[in-house]
Regions:
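N-terminal amphipathic/basic-hydrophobic helices that include classical n-h-c signal peptides
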Residues: 1-18
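Helix-coil boundary and interhelical linker segments in multi-pass alpha-helical membrane proteins
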Residues: 15-33, 82-95, 146-160
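Juxtamembrane helix-loop boundaries in multi-pass membrane proteins
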Residues: 25-35, 55-79, 120-139, 180-193
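N-terminal signal-anchor/start-transfer transmembrane helix
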Residues: 35-52
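Core segments of alpha-helical transmembrane spans in multipass integral membrane proteins
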Residues: 39-43, 67-82, 98-110
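Juxtamembrane transmembrane-helix termini
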Residues: 48-58, 86, 90, 114-119, ...
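Membrane-proximal helix-loop-helix units in multi-pass membrane proteins
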Residues: 83-142
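Terminal transmembrane helical module of multi-pass membrane proteins
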Residues: 142-192
Length: 193
């Protein structure tokens, strides 16, 4: 009986070491993702602050519709990268962390797909794709990668990485659009209504 217990504990320890090695291979990627996301969130806040003196019609609504999702995408990348660098993950905890972030993102981006409860909608078809469809797919990669991670860690982490890169690229694109909008708004433009 004791030898069986040792084998069981030894097998668990080996699996934990294997998992730590799997996550360790991705450590630089997660560091890069979290640093990029944190830096770009800061730059986005600088852009918003510099553009605050430019009065824009329905400015608050536009911030909610355009800036908030972009910050959420950056924050998702930062948060997931931080979660996956925690030491002593098991396959279950790493998989759950990834899936929970993915499900939260699916709910958030899905709310754009269903129209945000009938609120005034600034989105055209291109904006619906950029703010709803692409993030929904990226968060779906997180969920699928988290499930796959439980069975095949490298493949699962590759899908999670693809989702993270998609969100980061999307948030950079959205940040650029916001920056161009802020710069193209004439200084001191007043609401016409």
């Amino acid at each position: 009986m004791p030898s069986g217990k040792l084998t069981s504990n030894g097998g668990r320890k080996e699996r934990l070491i294997e998992l730590m090695n799997e996550l360790e291979r991705w450590a630089n990627f997660y560091l890069l993702m979290s640093a990029a996301a944190a830096t770009l969130i800061g730059l986005l806040f600088v852009i918003i602050t510099l553009g605050a003196e430019r009065s824009v019609e329905d400015g608050t609504a536009k911030i909610r519709m355009y800036v908030t999702p972009t910050v959420v995408y950056f924050a998702s990348v930062l948060f997931l990268a931080a979660l996956l660098t925690f030491p002593n993950h098991t396959r279950l905890t790493a998989s759950l962390c990834t899936c929970l972030v993915g499900v939260a993102g699916l709910v958030y981006s899905g709310s754009f797909l269903i129209g945000r409860g009938g609120k005034k909608n600034y989105y055209g078809v291109q904006d619906q794709i950029v703010y709803a469809v692409v993030p929904f797919a990226a968060y779906g990669l997180h969920v699928f990668g988290g499930v796959l991670f439980f069975h095949a860690p490298q493949r699962g982490l590759t899908l999670v990485a693809a989702g993270m890169l998609s969100l980061l690229a999307l948030a950079i694109r959205n940040s650029w659009a916001i920056a161009v909008d802020v710069v193209s708004t004439p200084r001191g433009q007043q609401n016409s209504k």
